[in-house]
């Protein structure tokens, strides 16, 4: 009989014995502290509904995780076979046991990757799995996980308490109504689960459906966005609303960390062209750089911590984007010059 699957307790520490000893000491001092998550992508709906579950093993580990299915897709496994929803609603695999089988057959692909580290940790330490996933044990593991997921102690709220989460910040569009956060506040979770203001869908002029997003911004803010100044006013209104709902931070994605203060007449002109559907790639890049400056200005006023995620070229694979949409595993790192890029903002 094979040995049970276990994880080396030093797996994340330096292999050098001296440095590993220091790492162990530091870890022991903090291991029992509460978790603080300043940035994350947990849907607030999971926690707002006390009866919510995590679904099937495929629902939890495969279908929503583009890090997982990108690896499998890179090795020739169609994303349709993994249940990833297509934009046009065309058929994809719906048998979650088959999806799980494909995952287990190829689990070895995640060896020595960050994805493999967190998959292994969740399977072993959260769900009590004692066998490394393979083609032969896939259905047995599926049954084990499904039984665990059906237990009350494996609901999102129960796991939230088990993990001793002190603060979890979600990522929310500037146009989000935050209704689920409102429900969480009513149930006493407002201090623990907080929204984060992410305005990319309206500040990045190259975003698909940008005009529709701006119209939505008008609706939720109560500001008729007809020009650049009203656009800024609407964003300021939304930031104030997010802060009232407990937000402590903002979050911004940009291909590069370039920042640039545009003269207001130029910002107005670019925005006017965008409303008419006539912007260029250069317009979008410069407007993003300018809006990062504006977001910093607003943060200096309202105190929301500004988080900037740069250095990722999103939707690089056009075929994947056309078929599966945004965040479908085709984001690739690019060089980011932070020193020059942030100089305008920091000065």
PLM-predicted stretches and their roles:
Residues 2-36, 40-302:
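Metal-cofactor-binding active-site regions of metalloenzymes
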């Amino acid at each position: 009989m094979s040995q049970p699957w276990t994880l080396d307790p030093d797996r994340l520490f330096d292999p050098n014995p001296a440095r590993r000893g220091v790492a162990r000491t530091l870890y022991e001092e903090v291991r029992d502290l509460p978790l603080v998550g300043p940035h994350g992508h947990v849907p607030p709906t999971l926690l707002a509904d006390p009866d919510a579950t995590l679904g099937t093993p495929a629902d939890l580990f495969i279908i929503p995780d583009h890090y997982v299915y990108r690896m499998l897709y890179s090795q020739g496994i169609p994303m349709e076979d993994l249940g990833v929803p297509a934009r046009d609603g065309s058929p994809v695999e719906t048998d979650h046991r088959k999806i799980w089988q494909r995952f287990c057959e190829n689990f070895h692909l995640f060896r020595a990757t960050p994805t493999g580290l967190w998959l292994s940790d969740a399977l072993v330490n959260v769900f009590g799995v004692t066998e490394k996933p393979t083609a032969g044990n896939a259905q047995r593991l599926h049954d084990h996980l499904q039984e665990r997921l059906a237990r009350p102690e494996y609901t999102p709220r129960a796991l939230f308490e088990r993990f001793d989460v002190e603060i979890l910040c979600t990522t929310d569009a500037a146009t989000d109504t935050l209704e689920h956060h409102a429900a969480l506040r009513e149930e006493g979770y407002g201090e623990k689960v907080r929204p984060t203001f992410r305005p990319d869908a309206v500040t990045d002029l190259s975003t698909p459906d940008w005009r529709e997003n701006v119209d939505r911004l008008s609706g939720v803010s109560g500001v008729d966005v007809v020009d650049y100044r009203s656009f800024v006013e609407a964003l300021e209104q939304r930031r104030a609303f997010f802060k009232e709902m407990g937000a402590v931070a903002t979050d911004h994605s940009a291909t590069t960390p370039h920042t640039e203060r545009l003269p207001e007449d130029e910002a107005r002109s670019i925005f006017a062209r965008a409303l008419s559907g006539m912007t260029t790639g250069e317009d979008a890049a410069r407007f993003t750089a300018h809006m990062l400056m504006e977001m910093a200005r607003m943060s200096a006023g309202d105190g929301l911590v500004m988080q900037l995620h740069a250095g990722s070229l999103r939707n690089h694979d056009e075929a994947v984007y056309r078929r599966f949409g945004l965040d479908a595993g085709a984001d690739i790192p690019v060089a980011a010059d932070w020193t020059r890029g942030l100089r305008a903002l920091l000065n």
